[in-house]
Amino acid sequence: EVDFVLHQAIADTFGYKLSVHSGSDKFSIYPSVAELSKGRFHLKTAGTNWLEALRVVMSANPELFAQMYSYAKEHLDEAKAYYKVDVDKAYVPDAIGIGSFDRPNVRQMMHITYGLLLSAKTAAGEPLFRTRLYRCLRENEDLLGRTVEGHIDNHLKALGLIKS
């Protein structure tokens, strides 16, 4: 809390908001963030929203998800060059079911490989996953909406911004 108060004082001095990156591991600090920031924060959820979208793909198109997962594991070391994360490939299973998706190493791997997954190409230069991923999400827009809404609601509840 001491560090947070210092950063909040700097933000107050310059009229900034503190940026808080979401993550299920951070829910425990959200009540303090809400209180100490006096509501002056920006919650960044793009990475965890991506993971929720992948949860939809896993449910709606398991074959596509399995291909993306395999590619992510194969390219994990490449992705780690862009991020300072502690993902141990030894703790990333070769395949997962819905119950395994919340394992920290699995989530980190799928989080940091998003750029590689979206930009991967076939030998013919066509998108390897992007087109099928977007199609899957469009075809399951209602499920995606409910999933992301629930995810955001969890953050807002932890921040005390909406009631449980």
Segments the model singles out, each with a brief description of its role:
Residues E1-K163:
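Active-site capping/gating regions of soluble enzymes
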